[in-house]
């Protein structure tokens, strides 16, 4: 795999400037210790850096968009398709597929929160994936790892791949016609940038419209 990929997150999630400011991994511990003296919320912003082995950590411009996916694992008890208590960078080469995937998950969260109607602003992140090799399961469409809503089998595969130090999994989307990636090691990604803002319009259980916000640009 060697291509640009798109990931969509809530726009309220900020850049973690500490990752951006470190150019040498050896400087991380010192800078973190100094910053934490004056910023009591630093741990919440940075997440659990121990979840990312030192050899896989990335720093510098755009690094926060990558690292946040790994230092902030799921907290809802359900997790993602291939992970439950560790982080994965879910993304797609086709922005439309990334929108379909994130729309499904935002709608499910809002339904379970018993919200009838709302809007949510989202941020599109574009990054470079690879060159790297991922575990390819696109041919296993009849397997239980593709169950629409139950992730047990897929998460078992995710744990096995993580234990084997795999760079991740290449799989078919079940929300749209297209393919997705679940990246398990941060150093497989680079050059992450804010791409644009979207507004998801949610009504009675579904995302009914996706609006590209005027002036958001592509940068």
Where is each model-derived feature located?
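Short, well-ordered beta-strand elements within core beta-sheets of diverse protein domains
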Residues: 86-92
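Active-site and NAD+-binding cores of ADP-ribose-processing enzymes
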Residues: 1-82, 93, 107-219
